[in-house]
Structures are given as structure tokens and as C-alpha cells.
Design a protein with these regions (language model features):
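Surface-exposed, low-complexity/disordered Ser/Thr/Gly/Pro/Asn-rich loops and linkers
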Residues: 61-82
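Accessory beta-strand-rich segments of carbohydrate-active enzymes
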Residues: 1-17, 26-32, 36, 81-198
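Predominantly extracellular/luminal regions of secreted and cell-surface proteins
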Residues: 20-58, 62
């Protein structure tokens, strides 16, 4: 996921990724076999796995082929160039909406949006367990109205309440291959890491 930000119509924004964010994320496979605590975002799956020591450098030797079972699923333990990913990956975090004096930023008159940009590629997004949308194209900016998924101040008073954000990268989501071509991997090159990991 890259550059998700919750933005109300008041002009307040809460960066959920990037250098201005203080929010911690967790990444895990759907079967619980692999867990990455505090992955750096924005980034990508392979970079997070490499930084956590779960995989070796995918650019070295045949690592991209011999380690594919980690991110693609256990069926990928072979030398076939093309195989379908079966393993889903889930990013989760919690965040709080700000309060100001006696007026909460969760008042019913405010509208909250989740803005998602540059996400590759098929992912379901949920807040507090409620599905709010699906992302299928890396080149599109998605804006989801999440007001109904966030409890209002009249329900919980003026104390900040934590909210859960879950992004599930599911290989069964139909997509059209709308992503940066150089990051897709080819028969002669692996996926491109999104940042310097030296």
C-alpha cells in the first residue's frame, strides 16, 4: 500500500504512511506462516520480507525463483517462470481521529474519506471490520467515504477512539494488469524493490 491518508472535509489529514506518519503497521500472510512487525510504508511486499530477513535478496543468484513460495504460496516450489499466486497478504494498523477541546473530529457533521494512491494491485480495504472498497488499478486514486465505519463522538464521547484499518491483497481479485510494467517481473528479471534496502 502507498500513501493512504484519512481526510475529513475540515482540512485535517492523518498520514497513514510515509515520513510524516507515526502509525505502525503489521504485515502477515493469510495463513499466519509469515509475520513482519512494523513494515516500512510506502513499500512493497518483497522489500518488507527482505528487510525482515524472511527472504534473501531476490536479485541474487536464483533467489527470486527459489523463494517464490514465500510470497506466492507453497505450490510455487518449482522452477516454472509463470505460476499463479495463491497466498494473500494482509496489512493492518490502528489509528485515532483527533479531538479539539469539547468538539470531536468524529462529529456527525464531518465526512471522512480514505484516500489511496499507487496501490498494486488487487486489495480489499476494511475499517473496523467493515468492507469499504476494493482497489484494482495502480494508476488510479481511490477515495472511499468511511464516515459510516467510524463511530461518532455522540457514541463514545470526546475521548479519541482507535480504529482498525485492514488491507488484504487477495490474488483472486480480478485485475487487468494495470501497474507499472517495470515492477511486474519478467522471465528475465524479478520484481523491482521499491526502495533502497542497503
Amino acid at each position: 500500500p502507498e500513501w493512504q491518508t484519512v481526510i475529513p472535509d475540515t482540512g485535517i489529514s492523518i498520514p497513514l504512511t510515509g515520513k510524516d506518519s507515526s502509525i505502525d503497521w503489521e504485515l502477515h500472510s493469510d495463513d499466519g506462516k509469515y509475520v513482519v512487525e512494523k513494515p516500512h510504508l510506502p513499500s512493497d511486499l518483497l522489500t518488507n520480507l527482505f528487510q525482515a530477513g524472511i527472504i534473501d535478496d531476490p536479485y541474487l543468484d536464483r533467489n527470486f525463483l527459489t523463494q517464490r513460495h514465500v510470497w506466492m504460496g507453497d505450490h510455487a516450489r518449482n522452477d516454472q517462470i509463470y505460476t499463479n499466486r495463491t497466498r494473500s497478504w494482509i496489512y493492518t494498523t490502528t489509528f485515532e481521529l483527533p479531538t479539539s477541546g469539547n468538539h470531536s473530529a468524529r462529529t456527525p457533521r464531518w465526512t471522512w474519506k480514505l484516500v489511496v494512491e499507487g496501490m498494486k494491485m488487487g486489495a480489499h480495504i476494511a475499517i473496523n471490520g467493515v468492507h469499504i472498497g476494493t482497489v484494482t488499478d495502480q494508476f488510479l486514486r481511490y477515495e472511499f467515504d468511511v464516515t459510516q465505519s467510524l463511530p461518532t463522538s455522540t457514541e463514545y464521547g470526546d475521548s479519541p477512539q482507535s480504529h482498525n484499518l485492514t488491507i488484504t491483497f487477495d490474488p483472486t481479485i480480478p485485475v487487468d494488469g494495470r501497474f507499472t510494467a517495470c515492477s511486474g517481473g519478467w522471465d528475465w528479471a524479478p520484481y523491482v524493490k521499491s526502495q533502497d534496502t542497503q
